[in-house]
């Protein structure tokens, strides 16, 4: 029987972030949401593609992540799709992130959003932007791995 505390369901994955950034360290953060946002997330209507996290006044905010309005409720009770949402982390994690982002010039990007024990969580990462040659190198490495797997499959 699987352990319930370690199981989670991935809602959305930001694959573009792994291509554009060299991921150095990841963190799990809670997110402050309204009821209609949670319902939309459970329905899988979320997009982290253009999203990023920002440090402001000792807090971390998720900006530009798109959560579609919930269809079953009227327009009056619905949420704004691209509103700024607060990320919930421990104080020592926030201090660590502040130091790395301000001193080393790193970026905070959301990698995936998932449900863990009924709570919506966001996996954010400290990333360093890749240059064009780094992107080409990672594509070449991935293609080489595919070729090796194909060759191994035939023999």
Curated annotation (Swiss-Prot):
Q: Give GO cellular component annotations, separated by semicolons.
A: cytosol
- Sorted alphabetically, which PROSITE patterns does this protein's record hold? SSRP (PS01317)
Looking at the Swiss-Prot or TrEMBL record, what is one Pfam family this protein matches? SmpB
What subcellular locations does the record give?
Cytoplasm
UniProt keywords, alphabetically? Cytoplasm, RNA-binding
- Chain positions covered by the region annotation Disordered: 135-155
* Gene Ontology process terms (BP): trans-translation
Protein's UniProt keywords contain RNA-binding: yes
Molecular function terms, GO-annotated: RNA binding
For this protein, the record's NCBIfam families field holds: PRK05422.1, smpB
Could you tell me what this protein does?
Required for rescue of stalled ribosomes mediated by trans-translation. Binds to transfer-messenger RNA (tmRNA), required for stable association of tmRNA with ribosomes. tmRNA and SmpB together mimic tRNA shape, replacing the anticodon stem-loop with SmpB. tmRNA is encoded by the ssrA gene; the 2 termini fold to resemble tRNA(Ala) and it encodes a 'tag peptide', a short internal open reading frame. During trans-translation Ala-aminoacylated tmRNA acts like a tRNA, entering the A-site of stalled ribosomes, displacing the stalled mRNA.
Q: Which PANTHER family match?
A: SSRA-BINDING PROTEIN, TMRNA-BINDING COMPONENT OF TRANS-TRANSLATION TAGGING COMPLEX
The Swiss-Prot or TrEMBL record describes its family as follows: Belongs to the SmpB family.
Protein name from the UniProt record: SsrA-binding protein
